[in-house]
């Protein structure tokens, strides 16, 4: 408890001056704060380098461990900690018999006060609270009271579980075992009042009064307070009159009245009411003073709050503990903590303003949010010097401090000493430590920490879980990440949202697709959303295993989740299904039916399956799907015809392709694109004569062949050394008004390097140069590459000449580089630098050519050295 104020006026004046100094010195910081602070969470990713004023980490951890070890721990607190550990222990498939047995073995002597202490200690873990409350109700010799029910109701409301509480009250079954110690009607009034349903609470109160029953002082005050909280001020006056008539007016009544004035915004009336209590009821004044101070500070009226504290302190009969704690909390929250050491120095002389450990802790956590590590160090050191007994929050704050300060080893040492010093890390501390260890690349230690947290029943959230599992995957330890997921799933502690979790893709990348599928099943059972990337990794992993059935199920589930697969992904799945040795048609049909039911434009679905079957080397299956379109009353589109034709051509079913094309021609459906597909496909199938036939037929139909048609035909003609026809096609292509493409130019120069026939065919087409002057340069280049003519331009600048004939690409530069290496190997690296300057990226072929240049230069150097050594030897012999 805080020390009482001194009665002397001199000390009082000193206190007023000190408090005003705090406010005046912090005014500027307060102004800055009003535009800054924006949250309560301490960011994990923010690490701040501590200043040189902070002692070395190894020294700090030793000193603080001794301080924590010798703290004053009451036996009852140790017992409550033991109860809390039992309550948090995970149960086996919902069977709570083991935890009931463990609690019974403690042979607890249950009293109202002890139950309230346990509920207070576990109030932030709702499940633990409810389990203990239920267990206590079943113990012989103990019955829940108004106070214990009030406590559990407040805890449920604080956790925003009002619906659960109201459902409990509506059924009224939870009170059956408490009837002889707690009347049902009393409990219902108190319960609904705490739940905020004052209308129902008043109905039950009316029924009580009608039957001649009445509330006691406790019940009246709970109801009165609820009416204030819900701003039911008309009903408030009625209940207050009932309290007055029965003589129940006490300090609690006064504090509720002050709260009412504050809720109504009547702060002046609240102050007048408090001052009226000073002469005859200082206890009532003290209980309401904190409420008024809190209201003033919440409206930024710090000067008024300070003045009120000063003046009431002068009376000397009012307990100021609660009011001062609220005042200090408001100062901390408002940002008056820029200089913690100065703040503590000015607070400490104020009698009645002795800080308790929980207030120190609130200052420490506020500074941690602001990354003020010097301030945290000052306060923790001040606590240790003053002999303030730390509690678990203090130790958790120390661990967070070590993490933020970058003292990773020290944080780990403090964590490992938890049994020695009685340290129970909170979920926040676990989060801090795991993030710090991951940032330090100590993923195995982070794994041990998270495994320990899961074993102790802590739920750490998706961010921490994803951070560690991803870190393990990046470190090449996906098996450890898998074990982590399994451990969390077994204890029902798997986060529902795991943003960016890479475990599935990591397992698939190392070939452990079965493990990845198993992890995905755990995710599904635990309600974890499977992301688009997870689905994609699993599908490609299944394709690698040639499990088209699994890939098909996954892509169906993927779309049911609202994701849209890419065309290539779907095509690969269809291809995998088609390539399965058995049962291909079943899965193929199932997948097709699903897609037809999902897509509004059914032609797209049919086309996708025709394409997939063609890629899988199943043209008959592709034709089966194509024919299904007619049976379903859907007219195949040009795209459908193209995909079917490509399916035949890719699988070298030339006769079927020709027959299919003939049928389309009979139906008048041979469009320009179909001709192009036919010509290109025949060339790739090495059916050059047929391709040339369709090229001529296409031109006869008045259709202009595409650039690709010319390119593939020219390439095939050159491959078969039909250079006259190839040059003729080049001439025809150029006459159509199109510029020579890089592909055509490279094919001509490449073949010119292999054979002189290209140049000879070119010379037989002299009319080319007469009608198209820029073709003269191309002819000279062909002659140069054939070795038939010489040019005055340096080889390393030949790209400028080529650029006048057709656009350059990396293939062109590699040909040039190869010529340079053959003739002037020492210029090779200069040419590579020129390539890079012009914005082209060398590839593997470039590297191979450079390696050849190195070998040529090394051979030259070796021969030169041998010749020099031989000359020197002969000279010595002559001498």
UniProtKB/Swiss-Prot annotation:
Database matches in InterPro entries: Pentatricopeptide_rpt (IPR002885), PPR_P_subfamily (IPR050872), TPR-like_helical_dom_sf (IPR011990)
Transit peptide, UniProt annotation: 1-44
Keywords attached to this entry: Mitochondrion, Repeat, Transit peptide
Residue windows of the PPR repeats: 181-215, 216-246, 250-280, 285-319, 320-355, 356-390, 391-425, 426-460, 461-495, 496-530, 531-565, 566-597, 602-636, 637-667, 671-705, 706-740
GO terms for cellular component: mitochondrion
Gene3D superfamilies: Tetratricopeptide repeat domain (1.25.40.10)
GO molecular function: mRNA binding
Location in the cell: Mitochondrion
Family membership: Belongs to the PPR family. P subfamily.
Protein name: Pentatricopeptide repeat-containing protein At1g71210, mitochondrial
């Amino acid at each position: 408890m805080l020390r009482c104020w001194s009665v002397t006026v001199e000390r009082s004046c000193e206190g007023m001056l000190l408090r005003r100094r705090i406010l005046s010195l912090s005014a500027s910081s307060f102004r800055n704060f009003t535009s800054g602070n924006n949250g309560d969470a301490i960011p994990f990713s923010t690490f701040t380098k501590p200043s040189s004023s902070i002692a070395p980490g190894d020294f700090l951890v030793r000193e603080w461990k001794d301080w924590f070890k010798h703290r004053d721990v009451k036996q009852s607190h140790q017992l409550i900690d033991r109860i809390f550990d039992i309550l948090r222990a995970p149960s086996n498939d919902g069977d709570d018999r083991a935890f009931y047995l463990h609690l019974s073995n403690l042979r607890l002597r249950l009293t109202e006060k002890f139950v309230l202490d346990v509920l207070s200690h576990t109030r932030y873990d709702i499940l633990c609270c409810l389990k203990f409350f239920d267990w206590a109700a079943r113990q012989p010799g103990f019955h829940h009271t108004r106070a214990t029910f009030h406590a559990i109701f407040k805890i449920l409301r604080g956790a925003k579980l009002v619906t659960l509480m109201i459902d409990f009250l509506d059924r009224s079954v939870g009170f059956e075992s408490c009837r002889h110690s707690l009347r049902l009607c009393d409990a219902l009034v108190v319960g609904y009042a705490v739940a905020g349903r004052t209308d129902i609470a008043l109905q039950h109160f009316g029924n009580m009064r009608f039957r001649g029953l009445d509330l006691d002082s406790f019940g009246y005050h709970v109801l009165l307070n609820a009416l204030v909280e819900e701003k039911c001020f008309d009903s408030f006056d009625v209940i207050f009159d009932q309290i007055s008539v029965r003589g129940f007016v006490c300090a609690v009544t006064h504090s509720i009245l002050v709260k009412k004035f504050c809720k109504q915004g009547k702060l002046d009336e609240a102050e007048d009411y408090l001052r009226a209590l000073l002469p005859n009821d200082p206890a009532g004044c003290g209980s309401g003073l904190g409420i008024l101070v809190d209201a003033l500070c919440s409206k930024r009226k710090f000067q008024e709050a300070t003045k009120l504290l000063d003046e009431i302190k002068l009376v000397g009969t009012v307990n100021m503990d609660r009011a001062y704690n609220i005042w200090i909390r408001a100062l901390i929250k408002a940002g008056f903590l820029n200089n913690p050491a100065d703040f503590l120095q000015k607070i400490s002389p104020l009698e009645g303003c002795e800080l308790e450990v929980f207030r120190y802790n609130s200052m420490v956590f506020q500074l941690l949010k602001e990354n003020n590590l010097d301030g945290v160090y000052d306060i923790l050191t001040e606590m240790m010097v003053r002999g303030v007994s730390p509690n678990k929050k203090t130790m958790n704050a120390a661990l967070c401090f070590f993490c933020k300060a970058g003292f990773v080893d020290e944080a780990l040492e403090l964590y490992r000493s938890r049994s020695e010093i009685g340290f129970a890390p909170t979920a926040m501390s676990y989060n801090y430590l795991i993030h710090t260890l991951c940032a330090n690349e100590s993923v195995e230690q982070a794994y041990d920490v998270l495994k320990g947290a899961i074993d102790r029943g802590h739920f750490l959230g998706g961010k921490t879980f994803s951070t560690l599992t991803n870190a393990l995957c990046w470190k090449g330890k996906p098996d450890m990440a898998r074990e982590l997921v399994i451990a969390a799933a077994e204890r029902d502690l798997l986060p529902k949202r795991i943003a960016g979790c890479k475990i599935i893709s990591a397992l698939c990348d190392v070939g452990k697709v079965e493990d990845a599928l198993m992890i995905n099943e755990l995710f599904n059972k635990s309600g974890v959303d499977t992301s688009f990337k997870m689905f994609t990794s699993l599908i490609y992993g299944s394709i690698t295993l040639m499990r088209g059935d699994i890939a098909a199920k996954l892509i169906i589930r993927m779309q049911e989740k609202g994701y849209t697969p890419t065309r290539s992904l779907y095509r690969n799945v269809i291809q995998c299904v088609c390539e399965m040795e058995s049962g291909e048609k079943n899965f193929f049909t199932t997948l097709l039916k699903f897609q037809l039911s999902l897509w509004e434009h059914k032609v797209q679905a049919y086309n996708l399956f025709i394409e997939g079957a063609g890629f899988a080397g199943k043209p008959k299956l592709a034709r089966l799907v194509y024919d299904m379109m007619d049976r379903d009353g859907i007219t195949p589109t040009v795209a459908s015809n193209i995909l079917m034709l490509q399916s035949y051509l890719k699988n070298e079913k030339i006769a079927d392709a020709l027959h299919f094309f003939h049928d389309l021609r009979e139906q008048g459906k041979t469009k320009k694109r179909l001709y192009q597909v036919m010509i290109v496909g025949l060339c790739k199938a090495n059916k050059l004569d047929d391709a040339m036939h369709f090229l001529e037929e296409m031109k006869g139909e008045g259709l202009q062949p595409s650039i690709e048609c010319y390119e593939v035909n020219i390439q095939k003609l050159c491959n078969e050394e039909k250079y006259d026809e190839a040059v003729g096609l080049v001439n025809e292509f150029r006459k159509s008004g199109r510029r020579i493409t890089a592909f055509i130019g490279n094919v001509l120069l490449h073949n010119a390097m292999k054979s002189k026939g290209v140049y000879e065919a070119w010379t037989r087409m002299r009319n080319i140069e007469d009608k198209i002057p820029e073709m003269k340069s191309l002819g000279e280049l062909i002659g140069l590459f054939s070795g038939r003519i010489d040019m005055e331009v340096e080889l390393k600048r030949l790209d400028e000449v080529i650029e006048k004939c057709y656009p350059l690409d990396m293939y062109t530069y590699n040909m040039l580089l190869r010529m340079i290496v053959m003739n002037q190997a020492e210029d090779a690296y200069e040419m590579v630098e020129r390539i890079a300057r012009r914005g082209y990226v060398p590839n593997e072929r470039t590297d191979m050519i450079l390696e050849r240049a190195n070998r040529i230069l090394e051979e030259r150097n070796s021969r030169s050295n041998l010749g020099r050594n031989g000359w020197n030897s002969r000279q010595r012999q002559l001498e």
